[in-house]
From Swiss-Prot:
It comes from the Archaea. InterPro entries: Ribosomal_uL16, Ribosomal_uL16_arc, Ribosomal_uL16_CS_euk_arc, Ribosomal_uL16_dom, Ribosomal_uL16_euk_arch, Ribosomal_uL16_sf. Keywords: Ribonucleoprotein, Ribosomal protein. HAMAP family: Ribosomal_uL16_arch. Gene3D superfamilies: Ribosomal protein L10e/L16 (3.90.1170.10). PROSITE patterns: RIBOSOMAL_L10E. Disulfide bonds: none annotated. The gene is rpl10e. Belongs to the universal ribosomal protein uL16 family. The keyword Cell cycle does not apply. NCBIfam families: PRK04199.1-3, PRK04199.1-4. This is Large ribosomal subunit protein uL16.
Length: 173
């Protein structure tokens, strides 16, 4: 089956659906790394964060695409140990889909909207307005590279994003 567009799952329409104990066959999250770069160095003077501006659900595939993009840009511009990046949300929400048969004779094999609860097809992270998604810590000379990496990550997400400076704003003025 083809994957449905993210716009089907972007809006928060109902209560959370997270209790995996009662569900069979929840697909695993594609996001496997939440901390990247120099994890031991805690003395980076500048910290930037990517905030979402609207309440929405972000699929695990979009989070992974944003993480890979930001990580690749940071490695190219700062080196493997020139930054620390953290993904701050986890895709707890289980997404369902009521699959429909199409083609000749589909009306005989499908049950339409009877028993339409749906099968588990993926996971998503529910985020609120102004919640931090990514945080990047860098040295002063790598500030522009970190900002560019977060901008590219924001382009992969289904909501408008904003970059804010958490620490070290006086160093980049």
């Amino acid at each position: 089956m083809v994957r449905k567009p993210g716009s089907m799952y972007r809006n928060v329409r109902q209560r959370s659906f997270t209790r995996r104990k009662y569900m069979g066959g929840v697909p695993g999250s594609q996001v496997i790394h939440y901390d990247m770069g120099d994890k031991a160095n805690t003395s980076f003077p500048i910290k930037l964060s990517l905030l979402v501006e609207e309440k929405c659900q972000i699929r695990h595939t979009a989070l992974e695409a944003a993480r890979i993009t930001a990580n690749r840009h940071l490695i190219e511009d700062t080196g493997k140990m020139g930054y620390y990046m953290k993904l701050r949300v986890y895709p707890h929400e289980v997404l369902r889909e009521n699959k429909q048969a199409t083609g000749a004779g589909a009306d005989r094999v499908s049950s339409g909207m009877r028993r339409a609860f749906g099968k588990n097809v993926g996971t998503a992270a529910r985020v609120n307005p102004f919640q931090k998604i990514f945080t990047v810590a860098v040295e002063k000379q790598n500030f522009v590279a970190a900002k560019k990496a977060l901008w590219h990550a924001g382009q992969k997400l289904p909501t408008p994003c904003r970059i804010v400076i958490d620490e070290g704003a006086e160093l980049v003025q």
